[in-house]
């Protein structure tokens, strides 16, 4: 697997390590709060991850990822329970026709892939709508951290997305 960090300069790598340290500090600080909750932790984690992404781009890292590019949305993604709760909360705000379409895609997704434990079919995420994430604001951490420097490397049907 091609790791995007291999293509970073030493200065960019140093910045990334610094940002990872900030994520860890944020996480630990959050756990010490009396009002701690898993859902608020996920929201803060997402915000921190987004800040890291912006910081990387500010530092000159050129990500190939763009709206409408959904190559990484054809991979198995595990989510944490609080992420699922945030997704459900978002889905409840959608118009009935969009929610019905997502429900149908979720059903088909489960039925089509029940016999594919090795995940060789690489089905589209049921939350994709015209190659765009319909839950982008609450997408799971696994999706937030998927980045590529080369869209061509993502276009194959490999079981892993190059990062």
Summary of predicted features, one role per range:
Residues 1-163:
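Hydrophobic scaffolds flanking metal-cofactor catalytic centers in soluble metalloenzymes
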């Amino acid at each position: 697997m091609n790791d995007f960090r291999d293509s970073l300069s030493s200065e960019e790598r140093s910045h990334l390590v610094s940002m990872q340290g900030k994520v860890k500090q944020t996480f630990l600080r959050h756990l010490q709060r009396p009002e701690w909750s898993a859902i608020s932790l996920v929201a803060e984690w997402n915000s921190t991850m987004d800040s890291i992404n912006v910081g990387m781009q500010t530092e000159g890292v050129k990500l190939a990822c763009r709206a409408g590019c959904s190559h990484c949305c054809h991979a198995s993604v595990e989510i944490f329970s609080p992420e699922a709760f945030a997704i459900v909360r978002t889905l409840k705000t959608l118009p009935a026709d969009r929610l019905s379409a997502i429900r149908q895609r979720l059903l088909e997704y489960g039925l089509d892939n029940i016999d594919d434990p090795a995940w060789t079919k690489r089905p589209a995420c049921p939350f994709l709508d015209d190659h765009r994430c319909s839950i982008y604001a609450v997408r799971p951490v696994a999706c937030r951290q998927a980045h590529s420097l080369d869209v061509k490397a993502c276009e194959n049907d490999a079981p892993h997305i190059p990062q």
